[in-house]
Design a protein with these regions (language model features):
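Core catalytic lobe of class I
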Residues: 1, 6-167
Length: 167
């Protein structure tokens, strides 16, 4: 059984395929080479505080651009997560044939702080979509909306909110 078949079988049986630990660029190249397509690609890279210290801004920009470009070869929707001050500049890094669709904010109350001063109580996400990609808003409906959707009684399908509160 080749890798593409193994991934398809795993997704069919359990809804997910888990690759062994490896560098993200290697895993993406492996998936691309094997023709594996995903409905969405979710990226949550390290925040330039990796092994051996920090990369220069240019090196980190190139790292993020490579992740986004590789993701665009295997998915029509890409999410880039991180702290707002880290990912903010990457709004302009949409891969070719993609556009920024949304800036999502996930905030959490009662965030414990071990430092003095300001503490981050939110994460941000940039959503990039390929031209013509379906956003699947039906996946974000509440129970009442799901029922009306299934009965064909919705005048329009509301999109998800751009601010998500953590419980």
């Amino acid at each position: 059984m080749d890798l593409k078949q193994a991934i398809a079988e795993s997704i069919e049986n359990s809804g997910v395929a888990i690759l062994p630990p490896m560098d993200v660029k290697e895993s993406m190249a492996l998936l691309i080479e094997n023709g594996v397509k995903a409905k969405t690609c979710i990226l949550d890279p390290w925040y330039n505080k990796g092994i051996g210290g920090q990369l220069s801004d240019t090196e980190y920009d190139n790292f993020i651009r490579t992740l986004l470009d590789q993701s665009s070869l295997m998915s029509d929707i890409i999410y880039l997560w991180g702290f707002p001050e880290i990912i903010g500049p990457y709004v302009r890094f949409a891969p070719e044939q993609f556009k920024m669709t949304a800036w999502l904010t996930w905030y959490y109350k009662n965030c414990p702080s071990v430092i003095r001063g300001w503490r981050s109580s939110q994460n941000a996400c940039i959503q990039f979509t390929k031209e013509g990609a379906s956003l699947h808003p039906e996946n974000f409906l509440n129970a009442q909306q799901e029922l009306r959707f299934e009965e064909g009684k919705m005048r329009f399908i509301p999109g998800p909110t751009s601010v998500i509160e953590a419980p």
